[in-house]
Amino acid sequence: MNKKEVRLRRARKTRAKIAELKSVRLTVFRTNSHIYAQVIDGSGSRVLAAASTVEADVRSQLPNGGNKQAAQVVGKLIAERAKAAGVEAVAFDRAGFQYHGRVKALAEAAREGGLKF
């Protein structure tokens, strides 16, 4: 198994538990250049809010989309958009990524923005 398959295997366990609870989830995906966050409803079929470093308004604020500063900006933005969509509490789905670095920075910024998890 390669690195990606191992990560997805870890993610499957978390997603199964979140799906069982039917809770709204905040999912994170990261690449070397960008970080993405989505708030997905309990059924897993609708995206309620999304934010990423690919967006023009976010990209204009940052020189680089692949660092902790960018993750903090995306975390605050996803919290604002989720609250605007009426979401207060979420389950954090780190998609098998370690809770460290950019993933941790995004999560902490989302908490500061008012999301509860």
UniProtKB/Swiss-Prot annotation:
Keyword Cell membrane attributed: no
GO CC, any one term: cytosolic large ribosomal subunit
A Pfam entry, by short name: Ribosomal_L18p
Gene Ontology molecular-function annotations: 5S rRNA binding; structural constituent of ribosome
Keyword terms: Ribonucleoprotein, Ribosomal protein, RNA-binding, rRNA-binding
NCBIfam families: L18_bact
Family: Belongs to the universal ribosomal protein uL18 family.
Function summary: This is one of the proteins that bind and probably mediate the attachment of the 5S RNA into the large ribosomal subunit, where it forms part of the central protuberance.
HAMAP family membership: Ribosomal_uL18_B
Protein name per its UniProtKB record: Large ribosomal subunit protein uL18
Protein source organism: Aromatoleum aromaticum (strain DSM 19018 / LMG 30748 / EbN1)
